[in-house]
Amino acid sequence: MRTLWIVAVWLIGVEGSVIEFGTMIIEETGRSPFPFYTSYGCYCGLGGKGKPKDDTDRCCFVHDCCYGSMPDCSPKTDIYRYHRENGEIICESGTSCEKRICECDKAAAVCFRENLKTYKNKYMVYPDSLCKEESEKC
């Protein structure tokens, strides 16, 4: 079952340390990354183009921008460690890249939680072909 979950998370395009980011999302939202954030809107999942459809999609847009701001790091493969204190995610010390990747993932997971009330099922498994507007700059 754990292997299936790992494969599902990988297929949705979650970057960074798949296990840690997926766990953060579950802890913050009570929802599994798959299927809720697999291909939500124009930015959740692999790639991203167009204008974010809502605040949840904007979380993914900002997450993509965060990863893009660290060209010397490998957010798709670097593994980081974190723990929780009083309910808050604390990124542990590691390399500078690991810490920055963790902070990007933390911000996205918290953003997902903060926008649970406005999550729209109509944007879950949203076709890329509908993301036609000009992309915003980070």
From Swiss-Prot:
Expression (tissue specificity): Expressed by the venom gland.
UniProt entry tagged with the keyword Transferase: no
Pfam families found in the cross-reference section: Phospholip_A2_1
Swiss-Prot/TrEMBL catalytic activity: a 1,2-diacyl-sn-glycero-3-phosphocholine + H2O = a 1-acyl-sn-glycero-3-phosphocholine + a fatty acid + H(+)
Disulfide bonds: 42-131, 44-60, 59-111, 65-138, 66-104, 73-97, 91-102
Database matches in CDD domains: PLA2c
Xref: SMART domains: PA2c
Molecular function terms, GO-annotated: calcium ion binding; calcium-dependent phospholipase A2 activity; phospholipid binding
Entry's Gene Ontology cellular component terms: extracellular region
Signal sequence interval, chain numbering: 1-16
Subcellular location per the Swiss-Prot or TrEMBL entry: Secreted
Cofactor info, note text: Binds 1 Ca(2+) ion.
Domain of life from the UniProt record: Eukaryota
InterPro entries associated with the record: PLipase_A2, PLipase_A2_Asp_AS, PLipase_A2_dom, PLipase_A2_dom_sf, PLipase_A2_His_AS
Catalytic residues in the record: 63, 105
Known cofactor(s): Ca(2+)
GO biological process, one term: negative regulation of T cell proliferation
Residues involved in Ca(2+) binding: 43, 45, 47, 64
Family per similarity comment: Belongs to the phospholipase A2 family. Group II subfamily. D49 sub-subfamily.
Descriptive protein name: Acidic phospholipase A2 5
Organism annotation: Echis ocellatus
